[in-house]
Amino acid sequence: MLFFGTTINYLDRIVLGILLPDIRSELHISDQEYSFITAAFQTAYTVGFLFMGSVVDRIGSRLAYGIAALCWSASAGLTVLAHNALQLGIWRAALGLSESCNFPAAIKSVADWFDHKDRASATGVFNSGTNVAAMVGPPIFVYLSQQYGWRACFMVTAGLGILWVIAWLQIHPKKVKAEHKEPQGLSWLEAARLREAWGFALGKFFSDPAWWFYLFWMPLYLHDVRKLDMVTVGWSLLFIYVMAGVGGMVGGWASGRLIRNGWQPLRARKATMLVCACAMPFAALGVLVPSATAAIVLFSLATGFHQAWSANLFTTVSDTVPSKAVGAVTGLGGFAGGVSGIIFSAIIPGYVIPAFGYTPVFLAMGGFYFAGLFAMHELMKRTAAPR
């Protein structure tokens, strides 16, 4: 259920970027207006993290996740009413606010349901929903848009979200054992006093911009710079995010294997993340190669290594903080990642790309991971959370 919830969450998120060439021509949206629309989503998504994590800790993942999914589905459906950039930005902001509950609720569920050695794998599986959405979304959305218009795509994702909420409330137990043991969660201000929370937050701050940039700008890059038609863009994104899904699951398996071989959990996560950090600058060189095919292959490696990084990064929270703080710490990290996403993947590209092209942005994104890993290494030292 976490996998399907995350998949639908990301289908709602990526549909705008995929259909932007069509939406842009109908609503007359410029690159700068698009950058502000993405910033509206990111701002709401970021602000939501400040309280969504605490809400999850206090009322439980079942109820919090269900309400949030219902709200983001409504926001997606109401997007069909947009007739200009401002209206589109408003509905995207509403979507972002409600979608900010997804990862705190999912990580909290993993912490409650799985042992240390299995958490990265479980996180990799549900987080692969982001990649499945990015795989199946482009060809499906392009087809639906060509047959029925772009507004039909938003109605489809809204309907899927409502169906998921019904299933989630039926399947999820009303209360799990960990919620009986620790009914009182922490606020994000209380979570901010934890040293490990800042390690996780800085890890998110330095790695999230790359994912957001690929998510929001990759379709436009392939269409505008590599001169691929919309159908080819859709299939190219399918391959890129297939590799992202594989990377997430392999990354979770790798650290789990190290733990089974006797490594401490946090050391295993950091070792796996170091490999990912070393690979990202190389993968970003896809922007420099003359061949569109080679570029797509390199970008697929970038998304794969990012998701391997992400599967382990998320799991460090349940490895290092008490169960009652997992949602709040995840929310604090999401806030940090959202702030950096607004700055480095929404606003700055809107000015840098028209003036200098995509190259400096791609290259910068590849180098951020080392700073995030260094901060995590210094601030996250405990290898097991007290239970």
Where do the PLM segments sit?
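Paired small-residue
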Residues: 71, 75-78, 86-94, 294-301
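Cytoplasmic helix-loop-helix junction between adjacent transmembrane helices
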Residues: 91-130
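Conserved MFS/SLC helix-loop-helix module at the cytosolic interface between two early adjacent transmembrane helices
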Residues: 47-86
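Extracytoplasmic gate region of multi-pass secondary transporters
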Residues: 16-17, 195-249, 306, 310, ...
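Helix-loop-helix hairpin linking two adjacent transmembrane segments in secondary transporters
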Residues: 126-170
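Helix-breaking motifs and short loop linkers at transmembrane-helix boundaries and internal kinks
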Residues: 28, 60, 81-87, 115, ...
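Residue-level signature of mid-helix packing/kink "hotspots" within the transmembrane helices
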Residues: 14, 42-50, 134-135, 241-245, ...
